[in-house]
């Protein structure tokens, strides 16, 4: 099993954000999101959400798999791509945080577990920061907590197939923190 998921410490840190004020987020706009990193401002503290490729052993090969991570951030925001920096204000209490996880089983039997999105739910809105294809470092930003409407499983499957004869099974689950 290949794990491209938040570790236990990251899950605990994310869960600790519930009940705090989501002040907003800072990013360098690229299409409908950001390339590589976003700053989440929560109760006056900055947390950097990153989507970076990491070399992982997948079957008999090493593949660069994009993985989500989150860490406290100090200093100026340095976007991985882009020069324009935008800050979106939210100023709402976090009621719930969800992580969307895909369990992938490839035709060759290799299994992967990948965190695909983090959804921050406030009293008035949902803010989803999601990734798509397994190698992409792009983070899509949307005000809807439905990953299937942004990146459906059929699209995720096509990203794993080298030809149409290959079968890929993807099970998507929501982890409520």
Language-model features: locations:
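Surface-exposed, interaction-prone regions used to assemble/regulate multi-protein complexes
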Residues: 1-177
